[in-house]
């Protein structure tokens, strides 16, 4: 893409499409030494963007942070760019926004890269650059829960990370970012993101065409919900995919798993893990943001817009973690944690990480395994090949894929995903008052259920003989709690009907797999005449936890733990 310097009125005509057709080019300062040289890193597809990569990576956190902060900063946004201008459509507005950072703002001063670098603390004001723009994000940092990470990006460029964290490259984020602009950057060269970063997405695996992406880079997708209730074990190729970074390429012959924190450290190979006694467990894995799209209807939240399909049920096989840790001399201690790290690395070689209590890891009834098989087949790359830790009954975020390191530690993982993500809050907590350090990381998920068929808006034929409609779905509760009942109503709770359950017979506390259910609901003559029926479903687990009725009562700014009644409107024919 060539540098564009038309007037703002010209920008509003949205003629940028010809420059966006094939790929994005990024603008980097010459003072950063942008020479296109590549440096390979072990276990990673990244190339180094420069000597300040440690700082540059955290620019990605505040790129994501801009999305998080959009809601609390909406009233503070600077709309001066669009004053007096009229945008013909939302598409043209977005077209304009995507040119802001490559356009000189003549009314603003110009700064050299050396000047920007000096603004690297709250005291000196925190400046960052994107393309031709210089931005002062000090006020944002002081209020944002991930401010300590954002601070590490101070005085540097965020350009490389827009090509990686593309889910944040939205109109809202671009508009918010431009509101922080204070000037133009002097002395730029044009660089292709693939040349600069080694195209970390070039070796992504093939996916089934039926998976519906919530984001493409990183790839996150769920199957059509209508397919979920058809089989007790979710087919591997239709199991939802949740990735936070590019999928790593791992040679199984070179694979090693480091284990630390016992009497002595140990390294296991893939063959070494497979030589250990094999154990299998049926377990559902559910993303913490499953059904977030329903919660968003109450009020906007931050996160991928998952439907009810970010869950799957599988038979996982591998070595038991409790056996491995005990062989290492690890003793029970309810105050300790087990940290897991994957091979999916960010540009600074920081891995995805998470942790669980040591008590869960050492409990044979906890069934935590180092899995190398999924439904009797080798793990696919999207699902963690060659080894994924499976923590039954626990939120998907703790089931770390591409496992490379296990550490028994006194504290939880300090990773972003353990400390500043996957946590719940009060409906009254907003981005002005949130404090991630005061909320526990999600472990066991709450009881939930979903209607898989019929789907919203479907035309459903009533059984002529008995006047019923058939409804199918899934139910699950974290912590190994059994689903004891699924109730359905099609008259807003006046009458309830109990579904028939299909589930694995397991001892109490070890019901890690989901339950599929089927119900036949009577349709009254009045409902037939009205033509529309709304079906509600709620599940009850063995602790008699019940789904809440409304999302208004459990809304949280991250959109996690979305387990209110599942409601589907259909047309009766």
UniProtKB/Swiss-Prot annotation:
Gene: shop
E.C. designation(s): 1.8.3.1
Domain Cytochrome b5 heme-binding: 108-186
Required cofactor names: heme b; Mo-molybdopterin
InterPro entries the UniProt entry points to: Cyt_B5-like_heme/steroid-bd, Cyt_B5-like_heme/steroid_sf, Cyt_B5_heme-BS, Ig_E-set, MoCF_OxRdtse_dimer, Mopterin_OxRdtase_euk, OxRdtase_Mopterin-bd_dom, OxRdtase_Mopterin-bd_sf
Iron keyword on record: yes
Reactions accelerated catalytically: sulfite + O2 + H2O = sulfate + H2O2
This protein's name: Sulfite oxidase, mitochondrial
Lineage start: Eukaryota, Metazoa, Ecdysozoa, Arthropoda, Hexapoda
Gene3D superfamilies registered for this protein in UniProt: 2.60.40.650, Cytochrome b5-like heme/steroid binding domain (3.10.120.10), Oxidoreductase, molybdopterin-binding domain (3.90.420.10)
Source organism (scientific name): Drosophila melanogaster
Keyword set, alphabetical order: Heme, Iron, Metal-binding, Mitochondrion, Molybdenum, Oxidoreductase, Transit peptide
Positions contributing to Mo-molybdopterin binding: 240-244, 287, 344, 383, 388, 399-401
Consequences of knocking out this gene: RNAi-mediated knockdown in larvae results in reduced levels of sulfite oxidase activity. RNAi-mediated knockdown in ensheathing glial cells results in larval locamotion defects, including reduced run phases with more stops and an increase in head bending frequency. RNAi-mediated knockdown in the cortex glia, astrocytes or neurons has no effect on locomotion or head bending frequency.
Pfam families cross-referenced by the UniProt entry: Cyt-b5 (PF00173), Mo-co_dimer (PF03404), Oxidored_molyb (PF00174)
């Amino acid at each position: 893409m060539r540098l564009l310097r038309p007037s703002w009125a010209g920008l509003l005509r949205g003629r940028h499409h010809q420059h966006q057709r094939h790929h994005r080019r990024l603008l980097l300062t010459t003072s950063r030494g942008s020479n296109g040289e590549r440096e390979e890193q072990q276990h990673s597809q990244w190339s180094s963007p420069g000597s300040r990569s440690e700082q540059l990576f955290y620019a990605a956190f505040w790129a994501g942070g801009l999305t998080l902060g959009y809601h609390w900063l909406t009233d503070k946004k600077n709309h001066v760019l669009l004053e007096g201008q009229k945008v013909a459509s939302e598409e043209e507005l977005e077209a304009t926004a995507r040119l802001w950072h490559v356009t000189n703002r003549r009314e603003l001063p110009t700064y050299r890269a050396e000047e920007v670098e000096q603004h690297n603390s709250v005291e000196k004001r925190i400046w960052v650059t994107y393309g031709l723009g210089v931005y002062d994000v000090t006020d944002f940092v002081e209020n944002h829960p991930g401010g300590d990470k954002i601070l590490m990006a101070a005085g540097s460029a965020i350009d490389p990370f827009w090509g990686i964290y593309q889910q944040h490259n939205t109109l809202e984020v671009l508009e918010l970012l431009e509101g922080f602009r204070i000037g133009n950057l002097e002395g730029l060269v044009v660089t292709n993101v693939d040349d600069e970063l080694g195209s970390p997405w070039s070796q992504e695996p093939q996916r089934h065409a039926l998976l519906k992406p919530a984001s493409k880079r990183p790839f996150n997708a769920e199957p059509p919900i209508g397919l979920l209730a058809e089989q007790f074990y979710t087919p591997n190729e239709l199991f939802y995919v949740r990735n936070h970074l590019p999928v790593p390429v791992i040679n199984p012959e070179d694979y090693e798993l480091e284990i630390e924190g016992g009497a002595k450290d140990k390294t296991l190979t893939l063959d070494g893990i497979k030589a250990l006694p094999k154990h299998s467990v049926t377990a559902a894995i559910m993303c913490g943001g499953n059904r977030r799209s329903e919660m968003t209807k109450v009020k906007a939240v931050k996160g991928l817009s998952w439907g009810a399909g970010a869950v799957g049920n599988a038979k996982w096989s591998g070595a038991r973690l409790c056996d491995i840790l005990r062989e290492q001399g690890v003793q029970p201690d309810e105050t300790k944690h087990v940290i897991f790290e994957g091979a999916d690395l960010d540009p600074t070689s920081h891995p995805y990480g998470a942790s669980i209590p040591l008590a869960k890891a050492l409990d044979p009834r906890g069934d935590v395994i180092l899995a190398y098989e999924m439904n009797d087949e080798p793990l696919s790359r999207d699902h963690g090949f060659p080894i994924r830790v499976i923590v039954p009954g626990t939120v998907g975020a703790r089931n770390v894929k591409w496992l490379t390191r296990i550490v028994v530690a006194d504290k939880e993982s300090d990773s972003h995903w353990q400390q500043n993500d996957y946590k719940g809050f009060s409906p009254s907590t907003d981005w002005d008052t949130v404090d991630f350090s005061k909320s526990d990381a999600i472990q066991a998920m709450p009881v939930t259920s979903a209607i898989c068929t019929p789907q919203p808006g479907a035309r459903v034929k009533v059984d002529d003989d008995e006047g019923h409609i058939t409804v199918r779905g899934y139910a699950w509760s974290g912590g190994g709690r059994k689903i004891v009942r699924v109730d359905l109503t099609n008259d807003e709770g006046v009458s309830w009907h109990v579904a028939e359950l299909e589930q694995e017979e397991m001892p109490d506390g070890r019901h890690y797999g989901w339950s599929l259910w089927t119900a036949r609901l009577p349709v009254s003559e009045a409902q037939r005449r009205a033509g529309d029926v709304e079906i509600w479903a709620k599940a009850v687990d063995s602790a008699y936890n019940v789904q809440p009725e409304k999302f208004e009562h459990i809304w949280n700014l991250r959109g996690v733990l979305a387990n209110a009644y599942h409601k589907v409107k259909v047309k009766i024919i």
